[in-house]
A protein has these predicted regions:
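Sec-dependent N-terminal signal peptides
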Residues: 21-24
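Positively charged n-region of N-terminal signal peptides that target proteins for export
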Residues: 12-19
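Generic short beta-strand segments
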Residues: 59-65, 147-149, 190-200
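Acidic/polar, low-complexity intrinsically disordered N-terminal segments immediately downstream
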Residues: 4, 9-12, 32-113, 226
């Protein structure tokens, strides 16, 4: 009799254990099934989406800089312009970017003085569509490469390159694209100066912008509300 009860209790526990793990598996599968499903985009889809985002945009440059005193400050340049091309060029062009603001964070005084007098520049960044969801929402991002500059200081011309990086990615809503407002849900483009080079020589590194007492310059292009 005792053995029978013991066996019955064991069977009930075994059944409860199986039921628990069965329910847990079902919940996991249900959660996984609700996750977005991503897949690649066809050339035609990329072309259509590129046409949907192409155009001229107005916004504000917000340039945040740290001058090495652990005291980040910001400069705003309103009525700034940005152009996005279609799939043929697949580029984002930032217009009249004030590279002179970088002079605030350059350690070399001669270079800083030359930068302070530098005119605004246009520069381009390549963009890419990475994948899309079944509902038509697409992942998109841009990759700024570099800004070439020729500055005269220390009695000579210096051919410099401002290397840039960006970690901004967008989920472009199909509904926003159809409504003609592709960046309604995410309207900030971010990029940073990673370093200043002359040829292969690194003149100054800005990779540690968020570290205390480090020099750095981070730029946001905030689109105006449509």
């Amino acid at each position: 009799m005792v053995r029978l009860v013991s066996r019955t209790i064991f069977n009930e526990k075994d059944m409860m254990r199986k039921l628990f793990f069965g329910l847990l598996t079902a919940l996991i599968l249900a959660a996984c099934s609700s996750d977005p499903v991503y897949h690649g985009m066809t050339p035609q889809q990329k072309e259509d989406y590129s046409k949907a985002i192409a155009g001229k945009y107005t916004g504000t440059y917000i340039i945040i800089y740290n001058n090495g005193l652990n005291d980040a400050k910001a400069v705003k340049v309103e009525n700034s312009q940005m152009t996005i091309t279609d799939q043929t060029m697949h580029s984002v062009c930032f217009h009249n970017y004030p590279v002179s603001q970088l002079s605030r964070v350059v350690a070399d005084s001669a270079l800083a003085e030359a930068l302070a007098c530098a005119p605004n520049v246009d520069f381009q960044a390549d963009y890419h569509f990475y994948d899309m969801q079944d509902n038509g929402d697409a992942n998109w991002g841009f990759e700024p490469a570099a800004i070439p500059l020729t500055l005269h200081y220390d009695g000579a011309d210096h051919h410099l390159v401002l290397k840039l990086n960006s970690q901004t990615y967008f989920l472009l809503s199909k509904a926003s694209l159809d409504a003609g407002k592709p960046f309604a849900n995410q309207s900030v483009f971010q990029f940073a100066v990673a370093g200043i080079y002359e040829g292969n020589t690194l003149l100054q590194d800005f990779d540690d912008f968020w570290q205390d007492n480090e020099f750095g310059c981070l730029t946001y292009f905030q689109l105006n509300e449509e």
